[in-house]
Amino acid sequence: MEIIIISGHSGAGKSVALRCLEDIGYYCVDNLPLDLLPQLASILSTNQQSVAISLDIRNLPHSSKTLENLLTEVQQQHQIKLIFLDADRGTLIRRYSDSRRLHPLSTQDLSLEAAIDAERKYLDPLTQHADLIIDTTRLSTHELAERLRDFLCEKSDKALKIIFQSFGFKYGLPLDADYVFDVRFLPNPHWIPELRPLTGLDAPVAEFLNKQNEVNHFIYLTRNYIETWLPMLEQNNRSYLTIAIGCTGGKHRSVYITEQLGEYFQAKGKNVQIQHKSLAKHKKANTQ
């Protein structure tokens, strides 16, 4: 089992890092007492492949030797990577001032600045065990997430899932759509009696639409639009991209075009899912 340990200075972005790892498929545990790590690893190894835990100064052992012994014990059976997050003193002070949260070491006798300095002195030995040290001083949350993704090299897990979704405007817009394309202006198989009971998944409808220059031109332009901006969307730290194609009833045109777009990007090696939101309504109506 792979275990990622996220540690570092309070205010450096451990919570952001843990959310990122959760988004790419890690089972995450926040602020685990390090003494419980061997027990947790034993329990989770039966049904988890990738686990991430965050540690702050309150959960670390009092000596670096104890930490080293614990990590060595767990490494005998599992693959461990320690990621340490850092930021400069001024940035940590500003982040705490902006959030108005209390530093873990702050007491009535210890100011925020003194608490940050004390934590830095305590955590310095931990950096010697780190597989990766990230300075988040000038990083946005998206940039931090991308650094983590690149380090973990989980290309298949981090791949953006593109959902191509057909729907009927008569049933309303899909609430989860990032982009909506309206194809109600294209030639409609509904007005051809022999095609009316069929759907965009059926060969006669596909053959009819494939003969329409307007349909092919729309697919070409839409495909190019998506290809143009997809690299930026893939770098934008998102897990899903939902592209909805709508016609009047979600039965013919939108279904065919959704299939064409989805199959094209699947052939390009993208992580694609094809959905037809309104087809079930037509099938249900036909059985009644």
From Swiss-Prot:
UniProt xrefs under Gene3D superfamilies: P-loop containing nucleotide triphosphate hydrolases
Short name of any one Pfam family annotated for the protein: PapZ_C
Residues reported in the UniProt entry to bind ATP: G8, H9, S10, G11, A12, G13, K14, S15
InterPro entries: P-loop_NTPase, RapZ-like, RapZ-like_N, RapZ_C
Molecular function as annotated in GO: ATP binding; GTP binding
Keywords on record: ATP-binding, GTP-binding, Nucleotide-binding
Binding locations of GTP: D56, I57, R58, N59
Entry keyword GTP-binding: yes
Job description of the protein: Displays ATPase and GTPase activities.
PANTHER family, per the entry: RNASE ADAPTER PROTEIN RAPZ (PTHR30448:SF0)
Similarity section: Belongs to the RapZ-like family.
Name of protein: Nucleotide-binding protein PM0169
Organism this protein belongs to: Pasteurella multocida (strain Pm70)
Lineage of origin: Bacteria, Pseudomonadati, Pseudomonadota, Gammaproteobacteria, Pasteurellales
